Amino acid sequence: MYIALRMSRDKVAIPTITSEIRYLGSFFQWMQAEEIIHQNPMLKIEKIKEPKVRKEALTDIEVEKLRAVVCDERERAILETLLSTGCRVSELVQITKTDIEGERVLIHGKGQKDRFVYLNAKAMLAIEKYLEKRKDKNQYLFPGSTAIIKSTSHLSPKDKHEWWTMPEHVKSDGHIEKGTIEDIMRRLAVRAGVKKANPHKLRRTCATMALRRGMPIEQVSKMLGHEELTTTQIYLDLSEDELAQAHKKYVI
């Protein structure tokens, strides 16, 4: 009755209901362990199946719109690296300059599992031009800023945007924050008129583009750093139109 009321009367989303069921189950389990109750009533509650929501990747046009409004070399390097490698934002911020070996990049993944990913020509050129303007000695590909940069009133409009070219405003050590990357992508999406272009959507876009161009799903899974192939299959869920086109191409 409680769950039905939460869904019908309170219009609570299914993920919230699922969490509440889990919390209540833990609470009654504790009560049972303390012998306050004899049986956990939540054991009879069936799990609610969440409807599968398809998460879209960016279209080719949306990707080009993002590229068209990039403001500087750092923004372009961030955008192209995410699109080319499909790495997580937590992995992007950890990349050092020595992790890059030509087109190959060493990624420090989840659970201390390293892997190599690869840069396409656009990403390699973007990183090269970006590093040419860097004059600091910070080891990270995308370093963090010093506290002084928070006050930019003394800088020219150009310098306010390209503070990272001035060593005095770059941390001697330490990488850019994940939140900063997300903010950069959020502003880029607004300028481009693209709905949502966060780092995770770029990761999905990289994977989806690779699959559409014929990259085997096992290789895509390895590129993304997935332990299970089923995780990659969720990322690469095809639309009905894409499935229909694939059927025409591959099924006689």
Task: Annotate the PLM regions.
Residues 100-102, 195-196, 215-234, 241, ...:
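Short, polar N-cap/turn motifs at the start of nucleic acid-interacting alpha helices
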